């Protein structure tokens, strides 16, 4: 029988102290599949978070023939014995980022067979732009009974203009193009920090990628990739979550091991609401002493406000003064936290891609469910500020992206514990 945990939170404490941010989940789950493209040498990747998505990928690449070992915050991958292009385990179906195996295996073997992935249920998350890119490089793509088959005699560099800005497609096609013949030019690409991180990792293995983080990425194909040592960037989303939690609870917290530039859109909103945010090297201090005012938020591709922080921000807006409007422009079904927040007394209603919020003075503790990763983070923040006790169920979603969340908040003064059901 599977062991299930829940989080039990007694709200009302202010937060004080320091919190260290781990390596970026969104970077790690793309870099680990990228590592299997190395036909020589060993990849040592550090600043890796102890989260379920990383553990899941470790099991997947082992099933493909890689030798994998882990230390406290590093993963060592020897993919020289990679012997399968067929990724069809239960773990593949469990997580969205397993689709990066398609681009990686296509680059390495010129073929891939991958179960269509899962992850958080936040609406239709099509891979049509991935397929467009693979086909443009010369691959034939078929989907049958939940399995995607991709195969090419040769991958030939070309110009690809994505119809929509897609983080996943940008990375996946970049992976395949790295080992293609000739030059590939990707336009209308996503610019998120973890895309730059993946490109830097590939370049460390011997790739020739220029322009990641700009409007156009140029990839000159190489014949092989070689293992390297690399450190993953800090997690922008984890950092933003702790910043928002501090603003919600009040107090003063230094968020360490961050790249402040990656947090500018979050910092700007918190300052607009009345919180204080100070940058200092690789840390950000958040201070909040009084009531915050509601603001309007629209999620946008980087450098805009991150969709992954929309749900935690919604919890903060629920206890801010006045009205707020949250427009989710990236995903069409990312408001599953709304019903759970309503159980806690929030005045929040969702219609289409927009949530309308009227701030209330207090939230009340309740029993709620984490329907997805970032909704779970939103409920933790709501529980931290609510009167009474909040129990959060289905926290396996939270464990996919937030390492030791209860320990980190406890060190900041929160009354939070993990309980086995």
UniProtKB/Swiss-Prot annotation:
GO terms for biological process: cell division; cell wall organization; peptidoglycan biosynthetic process; regulation of cell shape; UDP-N-acetylgalactosamine biosynthetic process. UDP-N-acetyl-alpha-D-glucosamine binds at residues 96, 125-129, 308, 330. Disulfide bonds: none annotated. GO terms for cellular component: cytoplasm. The keyword Transport does not apply. It is an enzyme of class 2 (transferase). The modification 2-(S-cysteinyl)pyruvic acid O-phosphothioketal is found at residue 120. It is found in: Cytoplasm. It comes from the Bacteria. Pathway: Cell wall biogenesis; peptidoglycan biosynthesis. It catalyses: phosphoenolpyruvate + UDP-N-acetyl-alpha-D-glucosamine = UDP-N-acetyl-3-O-(1-carboxyvinyl)-alpha-D-glucosamine + phosphate. The active site is at residue 120. HAMAP family: MurA (MF_00111). Cell wall formation. Adds enolpyruvyl to UDP-N-acetylglucosamine. NCBIfam families: murA (TIGR01072), PRK09369.1 (NF006873), PRK12830.1 (NF009470). Belongs to the EPSP synthase family. MurA subfamily. This is UDP-N-acetylglucosamine 1-carboxyvinyltransferase 1. It comes from Clostridium tetani (strain Massachusetts / E88).
């Amino acid at each position: 029988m599977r062991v299930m945990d829940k989080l039990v939170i007694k709200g009302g404490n202010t937060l004080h102290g320091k919190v260290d941010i781990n390596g970026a989940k969104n970077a790690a789950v793309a870099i680990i599949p990228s590592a299997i493209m190395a036909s020589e040498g060993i990849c040592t990747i550090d600043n890796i978070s102890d989260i379920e998505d990383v553990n899941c990928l470790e099991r997947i690449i082992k099933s493909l023939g890689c030798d994998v070992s882990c230390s406290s915050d590093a993963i060592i991958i020897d993919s020289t014995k990679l012997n399968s292009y067929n990724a069809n385990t239960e773990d593949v179906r469990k997580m969205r980022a397993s689709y990066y195996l398609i681009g990686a295996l296509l680059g390495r073997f010129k073929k891939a067979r991958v179960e269509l992935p899962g992850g958080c249920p936040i609406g239709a998350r099509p891979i049509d732009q991935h397929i467009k890119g693979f086909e443009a490089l010369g691959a034939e793509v078929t989907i049958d009974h939940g399995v995607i088959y991709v195969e090419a005699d040769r991958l030939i560099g070309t110009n690809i203009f994505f119809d929509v800005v897609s983080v996943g497609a940008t990375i996946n096609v970049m992976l395949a193009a790295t080992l293609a013949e000739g030059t590939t030019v990707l336009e209308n690409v996503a610019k998120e920090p973890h895309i730059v991180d993946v490109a830097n990792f590939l370049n460390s293995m011997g790739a020739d990628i220029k322009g990641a983080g700009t409007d156009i990425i140029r990839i000159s194909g190489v014949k092989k990739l070689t293992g390297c040592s690399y450190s993953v960037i800090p997690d922008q989303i984890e950092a933003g979550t702790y910043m928002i939690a501090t603003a919600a609870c009040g107090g003063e917290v230094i968020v360490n091991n961050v790249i402040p530039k990656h947090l500018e859109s979050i910092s700007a909103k918190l300052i607009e609401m009345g919180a204080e945010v100070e940058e200092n090297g690789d840390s950000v201090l958040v201070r909040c002493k009084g009531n915050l005012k509601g603001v309007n938020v629209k999620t946008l591709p980087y450098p805009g406000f991150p969709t992954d922080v929309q749900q935690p921000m919604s919890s903060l807006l629920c206890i801010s003064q006045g009205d707020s409007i949250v427009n989710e422009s990236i995903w069409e079904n990312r408001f599953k936290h709304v019903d759970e927040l309503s159980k806690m007394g929030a005045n929040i209603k969702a219609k289409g891609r927009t949530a309308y919020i009227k701030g209330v003075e207090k939230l009340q503790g309740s029993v709620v469910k984490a329907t997805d990763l970032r909704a779970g983070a939103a409920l933790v923040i709501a529980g931290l500020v609510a009167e009474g006790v909040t129990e959060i169920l289905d926290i396996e979603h939270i464990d996919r992206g937030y390492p030791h969340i209860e320990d980190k908040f406890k060190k900041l003064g929160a009354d939070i514990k993990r309980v086995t059901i």
